[in-house]
């Protein structure tokens, strides 16, 4: 560190410049990707609308097992597949974990949203450093929107019977 400061302070010294160049040209070794080892699988729950998903995250190769089926078999819609994989893509761990999930209740859209929340919560337990990225992307927020209940005296939740003045 002192060699580089001397080179900056004393531009007339050519030896200091070569020393500074040698210091900056030191090879930087690439840090290998972290492999996660847990004592037991990470288990979380995700909910959306009427859907409830129990997620188990284990180190692996990126396989999905959703009620005994693959991701493509359970969610044939590409939009739902992208929704489910979004937290893994955000933290760049698509091939780092195997995901086993039990999904019940709701429809495909609600189940996909619940699975996304469950995966995001599990990723935080696996690596707390990923929390800011997942939080910024909005994957840790439970979507509170649900079907509004029907009220008595109305035809639906808000639709009133036709009003006649006379």
From Swiss-Prot:
Chain intervals with Basic and acidic residues compositional bias: 142-151
InterPro entries recorded: Ribosomal_Su5_D2-typ_SF, Ribosomal_uS9, Ribosomal_uS9_bac/plastid, Ribosomal_uS9_CS, Ribsml_uS5_D2-typ_fold_subgr
The keyword Ribonucleoprotein is annotated on this UniProt entry: yes
Annotated stretches, region: Disordered: 135-166
Domain of life: Bacteria
GO biological process annotation, one example: translation
Pfam families named in the record: Ribosomal_S9
Family matches, as SUPFAM superfamilies: Ribosomal protein S5 domain 2-like
GO molecular function terms noted in the UniProt entry: RNA binding; structural constituent of ribosome
Assigned GO CC terms: cytoplasm; small ribosomal subunit
Skewed-composition ranges (Basic residues): 152-166
Assigned keywords, A-Z: Ribonucleoprotein, Ribosomal protein
Keyword set includes Glycoprotein: no
HAMAP family registered for this protein in UniProt: Ribosomal_uS9_B
Family, similarity comment: Belongs to the universal ribosomal protein uS9 family.
Protein name, per record: Small ribosomal subunit protein uS9
Naturally occurring in which organism (per UniProt): Mycolicibacterium paratuberculosis (strain ATCC BAA-968 / K-10) (Mycobacterium paratuberculosis)
